[in-house]
Regions:
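PLP-dependent enzyme catalytic core of the Aspartate aminotransferase-like
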Residues: 137-139, 147-156, 162-187
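Conserved PLP phosphate-binding loop immediately N-terminal to the Schiff-base lysine helix
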Residues: 1-15
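Short, conserved active-site loop motifs that form the nucleotide-linked donor/cofactor pocket
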Residues: 25, 116, 154
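Conserved glycine-rich beta-strand-loop-beta hairpin in the small C-terminal domain of fold type I
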Residues: 76, 80, 96-110, 118-132, ...
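Conserved core segment of the aminotransferase class I/II
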Residues: 18-97, 107-109
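Residue-level recognition of strand-loop junctions within catalytic nucleotide-signaling folds
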Residues: 48, 84, 130-132, 175-177
Length: 187
């Protein structure tokens, strides 16, 4: 649920656990995406649904949480304050907002490149373009992104890194500002 606050274009996030309340579900969330503090590993998990058949699992979680592997207490205290009140991410996801405009820019840039296509993201910080392999002879998406990194100094992630079966996709993070994304488009 880490992208639950990162939805755009009037879409609403639906928690997975709400789709089947009669099924035990472990949901995890945190601040790293919605508050744009990547690497700030503070988060939580919610156990929902019937728990009678997962008592051993819950006991294991409790045991783990009570071991010497304690959380960063100060960081955990930030969570409640961060989730209440004004949420600056909301403004970034509306028309005119930085993330919204960056998403639109990279989506349109991809559509303008012959042989590339993408579905416009409804949430998150990434776009997953598809490469027309009839136009571009790419048989190894990992080698493609490594070559692109070496030649153009732009970091992409190969699609098979996300369990995509065919070597015809890659991931772009659209967090850089539009002027930086425009430089990437030229490459």
């Amino acid at each position: 649920e880490i992208y639950d606050r990162m939805v755009m274009d009037g879409h609403v996030h639906t928690p997975v656990a709400s789709l089947a309340p009669d099924v035990f579900c472990v949901s995890m969330n945190g601040l790293s995406k919605s508050h744009r503090i990547a690497g700030f590993r503070v988060g939580w998990m919610v156990l929902s649904g019937p728990k009678h058949h997962v008592k051993g699992y819950i006991e294991g979680l409790n045991m783990l949480s009570n071991m010497r592997l304690c959380s960063n207490v100060l960081a955990q205290q930030v969570v409640q304050t961060s989730l209440g009140g004004h949420q600056s991410v909301d403004e970034l996801l509306l028309p005119g907002g930085r993330i919204y405009e960056q998403r639109n820019f990279i989506y349109n840039a991809i559509q303008d490149i012959p042989g590339l296509s993408a579905v416009k993201p409804k949430a998150g910080l990434y776009i997953f373009p598809k490469i027309d392999r009839n136009m571009y002879r790419i048989d190894d998406d990992e080698q493609f992104v490594l070559n692109f990194l070496k030649q153009e100094k732009v970091l992409l992630v190969h699609g098979r890194g996300f369990n995509w079966q065919e070597p015809d996709h890659f991931r772009i993070v659209y967090l850089p500002r539009v002027d930086e994304l425009a430089q990437i488009q030229e490459k």
